[in-house]
Amino acid sequence: MTPPTMLQTAPVESFNLNPKSTQQAINLKSDAKNGKVSFADWNEFKFAPIRESTVSRAMTRRYFADLDKFAESDIVIIGAGSAGLSAAYTLGKNRPDLKIAIIEASVSPGGGCWLGGQLFSAMVLRKPAHLFLDDMGLDYEDEGDYVVVKHAALFMSTLMSKVLQFPNIKLFNATAVEDLITRKDPATNLQRIAGVVVNWAQLDHDTQSCMDPNTINCNVVLSTSGHDGPFGAFTAKRLEQLGRAPRDVTAGFTKPSITTSKLQEPEPISNFQLGGMKGLDMNKAEDAIVKGTREVVPGLVIAGMELAEVDGSNRMRPTFGAMALSGVKAAESVLNVLELRKQQNEACYGAYKG
């Protein structure tokens, strides 16, 4: 994924139309009234000149540099909805040293979090999810056992802006995860997840022939691909294809927990089988999603509504507290297994030298 040499250099743009001073006064506040409001002298207004190729280079140079930088990431998050971005926010605050790539199939990130239920504006979060809002500095109405954000888009835009300000996090939107990179551990002979296979989301596999994808290696994948839409619960469905062994889904997975200095391993991929999401029950669903957020198979943490497809738990919409706090718990789960998975990957193919 190394960019072409031409794009690694930094060409100096010498294009110049001998413009007049570009320091034009634009004031976004005016105390004038009755037809005298003026934010700028629009008759004299003019943008600084630019050559079209300058715009192309400004975009492509940075995008190719990001592809090169994040081809080897510490963490890959699949899905930029409320759970995925909440996890990214928590990870970014706690570990600014880690490279974190977020892969989102939609052109517009945010998942189903731009509106509340049935296209209504307000967002409801049951307590104690309000503590996550407090950390972001987001206003809400306190209704006792729950809080209300006046518009779901306010929550999502605030969260997204904070995540994208972290220098160690890159969002690749309009990019789809097509498959998972797997590794077989020579010590246990079991598979684990070690990255993702990506492609442009707009490609049509039915009508185009050459569709080879690209890859991102990482130590832990966090999947938050939801349950609706063409890519809903993608990772969980792919795991079932990789595993195929029958299993009693009511038994639950082995939850990784640090009881001693050694981490308890989750179940192998060969034991994985979808539970299938059940009907709506808010009181059961939100607790189940947060408590169940974990490393489901080695190298893969699943959070948010995708987890309902894994465990066979209930859906809970339209309340969003579990999405935010599932993201927080997912960040915790990722950090608790990160070093172990890194050591395993280095033992398999050696440490990354880039």
UniProtKB/Swiss-Prot annotation:
Keyword vocabulary terms for this entry: Cytoplasm, Iron, Metal-binding, NAD, Nucleus, Thiamine biosynthesis, Transferase
Cofactor requirements of the protein: Fe cation
Binding site for substrate: 83, 104-105, 112, 177, 212, 227, 305, 315-317
Highest taxon, organism lineage: Eukaryota
Main EC class the enzyme belongs to: transferase
Post-translational modification: During the catalytic reaction, a sulfide is transferred from Cys-210 to a reaction intermediate, generating a dehydroalanine residue.
InterPro entries noted in UniProt: FAD/NAD-bd_sf (IPR036188), Sti35 (IPR027495), Thi4_fam (IPR002922)
UniProt-listed GO biological process terms: thiamine biosynthetic process; thiazole biosynthetic process
E.C. code: 2.4.2.60
GO molecular function: cysteine-dependent adenosine diphosphate thiazole synthase activity; iron ion binding
Predominant location: cytoplasm
Entry keyword annotation includes Acetylation: no
Reactions catalysed, as given in the entry: [ADP-thiazole synthase]-L-cysteine + glycine + NAD(+) = [ADP-thiazole synthase]-dehydroalanine + ADP-5-ethyl-4-methylthiazole-2-carboxylate + nicotinamide + 3 H2O + 2 H(+)
Modified residues (2,3-didehydroalanine (Cys)): 210
GO cellular component: cytosol; nucleus
Subcellular locations according to the entry: Cytoplasm; Nucleus
One Pfam family recorded for the sequence: Thi4
Cofactor notes: Binds 1 Fe cation per subunit.
Family stated for the protein in its record: Belongs to the THI4 family.
Subunit and interaction comment: Homooctamer.
Protein's job: Involved in biosynthesis of the thiamine precursor thiazole. Catalyzes the conversion of NAD and glycine to adenosine diphosphate 5-(2-hydroxyethyl)-4-methylthiazole-2-carboxylic acid (ADT), an adenylated thiazole intermediate. The reaction includes an iron-dependent sulfide transfer from a conserved cysteine residue of the protein to a thiazole intermediate. The enzyme can only undergo a single turnover, which suggests it is a suicide enzyme. May have additional roles in adaptation to various stress conditions and in DNA damage tolerance.
Protein name as annotated: Thiamine thiazole synthase
